[in-house]
């Protein structure tokens, strides 16, 4: 019987497609399982990272189907984004055409892997019907005040000519094209994710144990909650006139260090700095230096050498009443706190570095509880206050509270909570995205489009050159009438950040296609299917997508669309696929084409290798020889199935009548079955299950009992079906009419040991081991132990004989 993967795989893929084999039931009384791998961007070809992501999800989905669960395992396309525009420029093809052609090709590639997707619920986020509901949500958020517009310094990518969210700037560079990002001030739209900062933080506790600790820690750090003191520093009289205001707010998490303040520092974008520039109170050289700082993004600034400029302004210390110089510094960020810091160089490394560079005073006011204070560096740990007025002698923790209380009692400050998390900048100056459904009217201001006019669709007659925003340049598209007054108006020409689309796509899947024109999703569907039971994707999405999706879910809950707080119950973050120790990439020339692997070895080989080579959460090193090894195992597994016979039910086997080798073979088979439940539902260590199945097949070799072979294949095709489905469907169809594709029961007798191994010790020292029947008597055990320990007990008097059942025999001798 020859193994022909091409014929077998084509046969079953055709059958699955014809029978819509993987569509979920609309039977909401059944136990459900929602398995979702993060949907792909339709770049044109799948890569090995896709193969890994979707094979993991497919294995889990197939397992739960066999247990009788109602499984939702959908696929779709994260279809908007800059690569389509870049392709339009490079290949002179419309983004829409490029995108949908890529989707068609990639769908065939994924289907060729035998992935059990619900294609009836498939969509692309660039479909107008998807945009319609997204725009409806955006209008709701605008009306609620959750979407707003303001002028802001934003991250600008000079190459892509668009704005980037903070999360899309990686080490000072654009996350897509790697161009250095600069700062630019323009009118932008923001979603008020900060309104949900505390809930996003607190609800991370609900995910503990089900999400990787690393992802939870990354989100917690990104949200960045800190408690401290907020107070106003007032200018002296001369400085107030120059600055145009009486002072500015500062926030500190270390109020215990307030007596050590020797200067204050403002962000280059601070209103005071702006006022000095606009009123021409700074030299051209100073303005140029500040502009250079402003053009650097936050990460570049913080990593760069500390730079500053004295503004010839002074504020009054709120407690000592001393004059404190005011500087502008590149390490102060406008978006954190108030954009101003009280600098305590003695107790902050960053402030210390800056003070040393510019020869500013350093005043120590906290010392360690034990040991000497080292004044050659900043002492940043808690300690005992000194030279701090009435707060001297207190420990840092107590001093913090007392100083906050003093400020509050005297009306000069207050306890405050700050977050590093900033509002989500969602507008992009690009063509290929969801149009923002707002209209600019000269009389009425910004007005949302009427919902009955949705979706606002993109014009197709555009020329994409890479310069500016094609919607802004279009001669007619933006011209419209105001929904409020009926007068002439213009459409908003910005489009939405593509992370908006991926913030709710998992909800769309819950509702069958036939309802999509009427609703974004039905509540009865989300009540049943949500949250996603198992979500699978790369850890690179820990902050970006996963935080936004959590936020969006909470907003949609508050808008009345859903009844849940968190979208993803469990999260598995798979590792990257490497070749020659590096991440696969075209630029490195180390990619492997999945299509070629499938054509040469078959989809089941690709699936088996990808799940066997490493645990899902770890990086996977590509190995041609391991791929060949996976193929050989499947071929052997298929061809040896002829040793089993056809049956519609599991053979009845009398354990007592079997030989030792037959018992061992059964034991290996049932050990693999025992392991499978944990692997498919908790640990996802598919490599260990595959190894156990290989051991079981090896144990079956050499057996002549057809019952043992048949039972072995009944179990093994069940266990391996989620991993190598085509091969297992073919074997099971031929032998068992697929009656074994159900939840199998363990046979406890098969796992029982006939014998036990006992350690033999003489006077407590281990000398040997014996194997005895499980039900051996004490006398039989001692006889065998004495025989093997003969040379250590001969000629000596046995004083005591101890048998510890299942563990050891100890013989005590003297003489």
From Swiss-Prot:
GO cellular component, one term: cytosol
Keyword Aminoacyl-tRNA synthetase: yes
Motif 'KMSKS' region per record, residues: 583-587
The entry's keywords: Aminoacyl-tRNA synthetase, ATP-binding, Cytoplasm, Ligase, Nucleotide-binding, Protein biosynthesis
Residue window of motif 'HIGH' region: 40-50
Binding residues for ATP: 586
S-S bonds: none
GO molecular function terms listed in the Swiss-Prot or TrEMBL record: aminoacyl-tRNA deacylase activity; ATP binding; leucine-tRNA ligase activity
CDD domains named in the record: LeuRS_core
Catalysis performed (reactions): tRNA(Leu) + L-leucine + ATP = L-leucyl-tRNA(Leu) + AMP + diphosphate
Gene Ontology biological process terms in this record: leucyl-tRNA aminoacylation
Subcellular location: Cytoplasm
Domain of life: Bacteria
Subcellular location, principal: cytoplasm
Family listed: Belongs to the class-I aminoacyl-tRNA synthetase family.
Name recorded for this polypeptide: Leucine--tRNA ligase
UniProt source species: Nitratiruptor sp. (strain SB155-2)
Lineage: Bacteria, Pseudomonadati, Campylobacterota, Epsilonproteobacteria, Nautiliales
């Amino acid at each position: 019987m020859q193994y022909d993967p091409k014929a077998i795989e084509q046969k079953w893929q055709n059958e699955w497609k014809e029978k819509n084999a993987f569509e979920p039931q609309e039977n909401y009384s059944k136990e459900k399982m929602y398995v979702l791998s993060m949907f792909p961007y339709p770049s044109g070809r799948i890569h090995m990272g896709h193969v890994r992501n979707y094979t993991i999800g497919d294995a889990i989905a197939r397992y739960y189907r066999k247990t009788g669960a109602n499984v939702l395992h959908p696929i779709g396309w994260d279809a908007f984004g800059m690569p389509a525009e870049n392709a339009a420029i490079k290949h002179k093809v419309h983004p829409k055409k490029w995108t949908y052609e890529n989707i068609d090709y990639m769908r065939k590639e994924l289907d060729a892997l035998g992935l059990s997707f619900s294609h009836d619920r498939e969509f692309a986020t660039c479909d107008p019907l998807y945009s319609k509901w997204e725009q409806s949500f955006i209008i709701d958020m605008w009306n609620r005040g959750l979407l707003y517009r303001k002028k802001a310094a934003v991250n600008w990518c000079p190459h892509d000519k668009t704005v980037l969210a903070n999360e899309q700037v990686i080490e000072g560079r654009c996350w897509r094209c790697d161009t250095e990002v600069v700062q630019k001030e323009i009118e932008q739209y923001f979603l008020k994710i900060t309104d949900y900062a505390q809930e996003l933080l607190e609800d991370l506790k609900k995910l503990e144990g089900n999400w990787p600790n690393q992802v939870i820690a990354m989100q917690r750090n990104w949200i960045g909650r800190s408690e401290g003191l907020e107070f106003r520093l007032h200018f002296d009289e001369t400085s107030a006139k120059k600055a145009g205001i009486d002072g500015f707010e500062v926030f500190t998490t270390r109020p215990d260090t307030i007596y050590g303040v020797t200067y204050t520092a403002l962000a280059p974008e601070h209103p005071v700095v702006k006022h000095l520039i606009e009123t021409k109170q700074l030299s051209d050289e100073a303005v140029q230096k500040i502009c250079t700082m402003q053009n650097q993004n936050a990460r570049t600034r913080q990593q760069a050498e500390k730079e500053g400029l004295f503004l010839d302004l002074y504020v009054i210390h709120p407690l000592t009443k001393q004059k404190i110089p005011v500087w502008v510094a590149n390490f102060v960020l406008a978006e954190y706190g108030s954009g101003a810091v009280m600098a305590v160089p003695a107790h902050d490394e960053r402030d210390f570095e800056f003070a040393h560079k510019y020869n500013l005073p350093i005043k120590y006011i906290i010392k360690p509880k034990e040991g000497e204070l080292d004044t050659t560096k900043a002492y940043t740990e808690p300690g005992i206050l000194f030279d701090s007025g009435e707060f001297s002698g207190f420990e840092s923790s107590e001093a913090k509270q007392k100083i906050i209380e003093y400020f509050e009692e005297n009306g000069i400050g207050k306890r405050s909570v700050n977050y590093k998390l900033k509002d989500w900048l969602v507008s992009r100056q690009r063509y290929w995205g969801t149009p923002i459904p707002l209209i600019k009217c000269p009389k009425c201001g910004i007005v949302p489009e009427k919902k009955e006019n949705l979706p606002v669709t993109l014009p197709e007659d555009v020329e994409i050159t890479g310069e500016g925003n094609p919607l802004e340049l279009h001669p007619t598209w933006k011209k419209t009438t105001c929904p409020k007054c009926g007068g002439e108006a213009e459409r908003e020409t910005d489009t939405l950040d593509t992370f908006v689309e991926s913030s709710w796509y998992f909800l769309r899947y819950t509702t069958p296609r036939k309802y999509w024109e009427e609703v974004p999703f039905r509540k009865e569907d989300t009540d049943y299917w949500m949250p996603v039971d198992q979500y699978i994707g790369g850890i690179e999405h820990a902050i970006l997508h996963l935080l936004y999706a959590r936020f969006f879910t909470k907003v949609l809950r508050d808008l009345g669309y859903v009844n849940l707080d968190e979208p993803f119950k469990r999260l598995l973050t798979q590792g990257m696929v490497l070749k020659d120790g590096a991440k696969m990439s075209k630029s490195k020339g180390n990619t492997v084409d999945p299509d070629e692997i499938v054509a040469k070895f078959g989809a089941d080989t690709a699936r088996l290798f990808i799940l066997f080579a490493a645990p899902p959460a770890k990086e996977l090193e590509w190995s041609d020889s391991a791929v060949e090894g996976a193929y050989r195992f499947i071929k052997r597994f298929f061809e040896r199935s002829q040793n089993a016979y056809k049956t519609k039910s599991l053979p009845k086997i009398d354990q007592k009548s079997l030989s030792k080798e037959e018992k061992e073979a059964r034991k290996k088979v049932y050990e693999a079955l025992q392991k499978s439940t944990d692997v498919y539902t908790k640990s996802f260590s598919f490599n260990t299950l595959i190894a156990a199945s290989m051991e079981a097949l090896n144990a079956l070799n050499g057996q002549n009992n057809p019952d043992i072979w048949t039972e072995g294949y009944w179990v093994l095709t069940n266990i391996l079906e989620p991993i190598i489905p085509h091969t297992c469907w073919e074997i099971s169809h031929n032998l068992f009419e697929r009656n074994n594709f159900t939840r199998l029961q363990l046979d406890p007798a098969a796992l029982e040991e006939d014998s036990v191994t006992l350690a033999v010790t003489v006077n407590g020292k281990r000398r040997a081991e014996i194997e005895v029947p499980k039900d051996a008597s004490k006398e039989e055990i001692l006889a065998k132990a004495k025989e093997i320990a003969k040379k250590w007990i001969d000629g000596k008097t046995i004083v005591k004989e101890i048998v510890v059942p299942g563990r050891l025999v100890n013989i005590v001798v003297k003489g």
